[in-house]
Design a protein with these regions (language model features):
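Acidic, polar-rich low-complexity tracts and alpha-helical solenoid repeat scaffolds
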Residues: 1-423
Length: 423
C-alpha cells in the first residue's frame, strides 16, 4: 500500500527501485518494479533490473525469464539477454536455467533466437548430446542446409569429442547431399578419425584404419580428381607410415601425379616426395634418389627443395655415404623451416660425432643401417643389428642413441613398458 501510494509516475520507479536495491532491500525493490509495470502497462518494463534482483536472491529460473523479456521486448537485445543468461550458468543454477529456457521454447517453438539460446546453453554446460539435438532442430526448422550442424561438429572436434563430431558430419552426409558442406563433412569426418588416432600413445591403429576407410569412402563418392588432392595425400601418408600398405599408397600417389594438369606445383612435389619415401621403404634406392633429386632440382631455393635435399642426405646416410650426406646437408640454406634445419643439424652432428674419433666408421654404418631397417618397418632385423652393435662397441658414443632407437621400435609395436625400460 505504501508503494502504491508513493509511486505515481514511471520516472519515480527507477529512482526508488535503485535506492532500495543499493540498500539491500531486494524484496521491496522488486515490488517497486512490479508497480512500475502496472503504471506503464508494459509486462516487459524494467526486465533487466528485475532479473538482477532475482539473480541476487538466487532465483535463477525467474532471472532467466526476466532476461528473456529483454529479448521479447526487442529482438535486438538478443545478444545482451543471451550473454546475461549464459553468465549465470553453473552447478547451482544450471537446472533452473534449463527448465526456464525449455518452457520458453515450448511456448514459442518457432522462435529462432530462443532455439539458439537453448543450444548455446547446452554447449556451455557441456551437455553436448542435448546440444546436438537442438542444433539438428534448428537446422530442420530454419532450413540451414547443415551450416550450423557443421559448425557444431567443429566445436566438438575442438573439445576432442570425435564420436559426436562424426555424428554431426553423418547428419549432413545423410540429409544434405546438395549442401555446400556435403564434401567437407566427408573430409572432416576422415580427419576426425586421424586426429583421434594421434591423440593416443602409441598411435591407435584401429582409428588409423577408420580414417583410411573414411578417405576411401570420400574418394569413391567424389572421384580421385586433382581438386581432391588433400584426402588422397592424407590417406596415402597413413597407409605408408602407419599401415605399411606401400603398394596401394604408391598406386594412389602415382595416379595423382601422373598429370600435373589441375594440380598445384607444390602439391605435386609434396606427393612426389612421399613416393620417394615409399621407394626407400621398398629398398629401391635408385628410384628413391631419382625422385628426391627431381624435386630438389625443380625447387632448388624453396622449402620443398630443402626438404628434398634433406631426404637425399638421409638416403646417403643410410647407405653409409657419410661425406656425401654432409655435403648435401651443407647445401641446405639457412632460411629453411625450423623443422628441416633442426633435423639437418642433428643428422650432421651425428655424423661428425661418430666419424671424427678414429678412422673407422663401422659402428655408425651399423647404426645407420639399423635406422633404415626401422624406417622400413623391419623391426626384428633392426633390433638384432642394434644388439650386435652394442655388443661389439660397448662403450661407443652411440650407446644412448642405440637405446633410444630400441625404445622407438617397441613403442611402434605398442610395447610401452618395454619401450620405457630403454629410456
Amino acid at each position: 500500500d505504501v508503494i502504491s501510494k508513493s509511486i505515481k509516475k514511471e520516472g519515480e520507479v527507477i529512482g526508488i527501485g535503485s535506492f532500495l536495491y543499493q540498500q539491500g532491500r531486494l524484496t521491496w525493490a522488486l515490488k517497486v518494479y512490479k508497480k512500475g509495470r502496472q503504471i506503464t502497462r508494459n509486462p516487459y518494463a524494467f526486465a533487466n533490473e528485475v532479473a538482477n534482483i532475482h539473480l541476487q536472491l538466487g532465483e535463477f529460473a525467474q532471472a532467466t525469464e526476466e532476461y528473456l523479456k529483454l529479448y521479447y521486448a526487442n529482438p535486438q537485445n538478443y545478444s545482451a539477454a543471451n550473454l546475461s543468461i549464459l553468465n549465470m550458468v553453473g552447478p547451482p543454477s544450471q537446472n533452473e536455467i534449463e527448465q526456464a529456457l525449455l518452457r520458453a521454447v515450448d511456448k514459442r517453438p518457432s522462435d529462432r533466437g530462443l532455439r539458439n539460446m537453448v543450444f548455446e546453453f547446452y554447449v556451455l554446460a557441456e551437455n553436448f548430446m542435448e546440444a546436438f539435438v537442438q542444433v539438428k532442430s534448428i537446422d530442420r526448422l530454419f532450413k540451414q542446409e547443415g551450416e550450423r550442424v557443421y559448425n557444431f561438429a567443429e566445436t566438438m572436434r575442438n573439445n576432442k569429442e570425435y564420436a559426436l563430431s562424426n555424428k554431426a558430419y553423418d547428419y549432413i552426409i545423410n540429409r544434405h547431399k546438395n549442401s555446400p558442406f556435403f564434401f567437407q563433412a566427408h573430409f572432416q569426418k576422415a580427419i576426425n578419425n586421424e586426429l583421434k588416432a594421434f591423440d593416443q600413445v602409441p598411435v591407435d591403429k584401429a582409428s588409423v584404419e577408420a580414417a583410411v576407410d573414411a578417405y576411401k569412402e570420400l574418394l569413391n563418392t567424389f572421384g580421385r580428381k586433382p581438386e581432391y588432392y588433400d584426402p588422397v595425400y592424407r590417406m596415402s601418408r597413413l597407409m605408408v607410415f602407419y599401415l605399411f600398405d606401400l603398394d596401394n599408397a604408391l598406386e594412389e600417389l602415382e595416379n595423382l601425379t601422373a598429370s600435373r594438369q589441375g594440380l598445384p606445383q607444390d602439391r605435386w612435389a609434396e606427393a612426389r616426395l612421399l613416393i620417394g619415401d615409399i621407394q626407400l621403404m621398398q629398398q629401391d634406392f635408385n628410384k628413391s634418389k631419382l625422385t628426391y633429386t627431381e624435386v630438389s632440382d625443380i625447387y632448388r631455393d624453396r622449402q620443398l627443395g630443402a626438404l628434398a635435399k634433406y631426404k637425399l642426405s638421409e638416403l646417403a646416410y643410410y647407405k653409409g655415404e657419410f661425406n656425401l650426406a654432409q655435403a648435401l646437408l651443407g647445401a641446405i640454406k639457412d632460411n629453411t623451416s625450423n623443422d628441416i634445419s633442426n633435423d639437418a643439424i642433428k643428422l650432421n652432428l651425428t655424423i661428425m660425432d661418430n666419424t671424427g674419433l678414429d678412422s673407422t666408421t663401422t659402428a655408425l654404418e651399423m647404426f645407420a643401417n639399423a635406422q633404415l631397417l626401422t624406417y622400413q618397418r623391419d623391426y626384428e632385423a633392426s633390433l638384432s643389428l642394434l644388439d650386435s652393435l652394442a655388443y661389439k662397441f660397448p662403450s661407443h658414443p652411440l650407446a644412448d642413441e642405440i637405446l633410444w632407437e630400441k625404445a622407438t621400435i617397441y613403442l611402434n609395436q605398442n610395447e610401452i613398458e618395454r619401450a620405457l625400460s630403454f629410456i
